[in-house]
Amino acid sequence: MTHSKRWLEEHEKDPYVKRAKKEGYPSRAAYKLLEIHQKYKLFKPSMNVIDLGAAPGGWSQVAKDLVGPKGVVIAIDLLPMQSMLDVIFIQGDFNEPEIFNQLEAIVAKKTLTGQVDLVISDMAPNISGIKNVDQSRSLHLVELAWDCAQKLLARGGTFLVKVFQGPGVDRFLINLRPYFNQVKFLKPSASRSRSSEIYILAGEFLGYNQRV
């Protein structure tokens, strides 16, 4: 059986996939974020959130439900995403200056401080099937997400990002820790057991110029 056929079979049998269809979420990824929120209380009413790599929208939908009508959710992705009520969507690469400037302008317009309370990223690279290549690409996306968070995350804010376990992750953690009071690894039960994906949860941002 090819990798693609095996994935399709697993996908069709996956209880989280079935649950997402039943409950109206665009993807099973919503349950990873819900589980993390239930344990760590990421979201509060009226929070301002950036969702990087948001398509197809599972995390954005969860975020908007939890921050409520007075909160702001800005979603960004290279891929198109179905329109969601009260979610601002930017299609493009946030690493490109023009797109980042657009993101920054929206944050400035929609928030009092020009910063957000929470930056979340469930980004994953296009999977090649070559483990070390995919892991390296995943880590690169994490570094891009962190670059964005440095510029737009408010002091006291939270950064949540997915990464594939492997070389370079420990080094990234060493570089990240001085900027946050709390940093931990998470593996939600909705993550497939054979997947190398984990989540880095960094809380109580000290500010980018605040090095310990």
From Swiss-Prot:
InterPro entries: RNA_methyltr_RlmE, RNA_MeTrfase_FtsJ_dom, rRNA-MeTfrase_E, SAM-dependent_MTases_sf. S-adenosyl-L-methionine binds at residues 57, 59, 77, 93, 122. The keyword Nuclease does not apply. Keywords: Cytoplasm, Methyltransferase, rRNA processing, S-adenosyl-L-methionine, Transferase. Specifically methylates the uridine in position 2552 of 23S rRNA at the 2'-O position of the ribose in the fully assembled 50S ribosomal subunit. One of its GO terms (biological process) is RNA methylation. Transmembrane segments: none annotated. Its EC number is 2.1.1.166. GO terms for cellular component: cytoplasm. It holds the Pfam family FtsJ. The active site is at 162 (proton acceptor). This is Ribosomal RNA large subunit methyltransferase E. Its main location: cytoplasm. It comes from the Bacteria. Belongs to the class I-like SAM-binding methyltransferase superfamily. RNA methyltransferase RlmE family. The keyword rRNA processing applies. GO terms for molecular function: rRNA (uridine-2'-O-)-methyltransferase activity. It catalyses: uridine(2552) in 23S rRNA + S-adenosyl-L-methionine = 2'-O-methyluridine(2552) in 23S rRNA + S-adenosyl-L-homocysteine + H(+). It is found in: Cytoplasm. It is an enzyme of class 2 (transferase).
